[in-house]
Amino acid sequence: KNWVWTRINKSKSEADYRQWFALLKECGISGVMFEGYDENLYRMCKEAGLEAHFWKWTMNRAELLNVHPDWFAVNRKGESTHDKPAYVDYYRFLCPNHEGVAQYLADDYVKIAHLPYVDGVHLDYVRFPDVVLPVSLWKNYGIEQTSEHPEYDYCYCDVCRTKFKEQTGRDPLELKYPMEDQSWINFRLDAISRVVDQITKAVKADGKAISAAVF
């Protein structure tokens, strides 16, 4: 299947969108991933023979800054994305191991899946912040990342440190080369996977499709 992603443009007319949806269908596009929700737009999309999916950030959740400040990921320097995000101000990533995070996200996506004319949901930012950016972006931030720097390496919050120590007997903050420790790498990968599993089960139980942007 072929898909397109788009932001909802309030300045475009209904006729503009109908023409665009028809063109997408003619070009062999299967569906549209929308950033945002507009019931009429989703309905028109489906009337054109396309699937309509709701695209949304997963681990990057600034709406929780005041409600659950403890849920945010912490880097190797002890800095939280709650008040000191990496790279850009909107990088407010959650820690997947905090109790309540996975359930909150699953409930949020199910609410989206329940919306009229929504065929499925698409998960983006299903990860921790970039520990190393592409070389082409280094100059944008005035950095050089020839190795993993502690200020971009997450999550070293108390919950993650405790859980990892229970599993391995080691504190991740005491690892000499955390970037090469496979058990520490897998610990964080598995934490993200468990969140995705919970979201997936909840959305599929509602009879809707789910996909993700893998980085």
Positions of PLM-derived features:
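Hydrophobic faces of well-ordered beta-strands that scaffold small-molecule active sites
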Residues: 2-6, 32-34, 52-56, 121-124, ...
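Active-site-adjacent "subsite" loops/lids of carbohydrate-active enzymes
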Residues: 53-116, 133
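Active-site-proximal loop/short-helix segments
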Residues: 122-180
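Aromatic-lined carbohydrate-recognition surfaces of secreted/lumenal glycan-active proteins
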Residues: 53, 122, 126, 178-215
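Active-site beta-loop-alpha junctions enriched in small/polar residues
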Residues: 7-9, 37, 57-59, 126-128, ...
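Boundary/entry segment of secreted carbohydrate-active catalytic domains
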Residues: 1-20
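Catalytic domains of carbohydrate-active enzymes, especially glycoside hydrolases
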Residues: 14-40, 115-118
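The substrate-binding groove and active-site-proximal loops of carbohydrate-active enzymes
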Residues: 5-11, 28-35, 87-104, 178-193
